[in-house]
From Swiss-Prot:
This is Large ribosomal subunit protein bL20. Keywords: Ribonucleoprotein, Ribosomal protein, RNA-binding, rRNA-binding. Belongs to the bacterial ribosomal protein bL20 family. The gene is rplT. Coiled coil: none annotated. CDD domains: Ribosomal_L20. The keyword Disulfide bond does not apply. Binds directly to 23S ribosomal RNA and is necessary for the in vitro assembly process of the 50S ribosomal subunit. It is not involved in the protein synthesizing functions of that subunit. GO terms for biological process: ribosomal large subunit assembly; translation. Pfam families: Ribosomal_L20.
Length: 119
């Protein structure tokens, strides 16, 4: 049986790791052992932060909505309660965008929420 030398496959594997480690600093980009560890850790961070990104953006939308309804004499929680009572089914992302780009439309929604709270 012929002897199998793994130079080609090892080189291909290493090349794949180095490609993923491109842009890393120091030995993390060109030493296989540290590059592997760095790529693994980068993958862990990427996985974690894909989840965290959703939380962060939701918090940002809530802050923007809160800032937009405060001058109208409401807090965020009161505004959301008013929306629920009035039956307006607009998510926080859209509300946040409306507050920035279309203040008149946001004001109309806020008035509807206020009316539902009064009734």
């Amino acid at each position: 049986m012929a002897r199998v030398k793994r130079g080609v496959t090892a080189h291909a594997k290493h090349k794949k790791v180095y490609k993923l480690a491109k842009g890393f600093r120091g030995r993390r980009k060109n030493t296989i052992r540290t590059a592997k560890a760095a790529v693994d850790k980068a993958g862990q961070y990427a996985f974690r932060d894909r989840k965290r990104k959703k939380r962060t953006f939701r918090a940002l939308w809530i802050q923007r909505i809160n800032a937009a309804v405060r001058p109208l004499g409401m807090t965020y929680s009161v505004f959301i309660n008013g929306l629920a009572k009035s039956g307006v089914m607009v998510d926080r992302k859209v509300l946040s965008d409306l507050a920035i780009t279309e203040p008149a439309a946001f004001l109309a929604i806020a008035e509807k929420a206020k009316a539902a709270l009064a009734a």
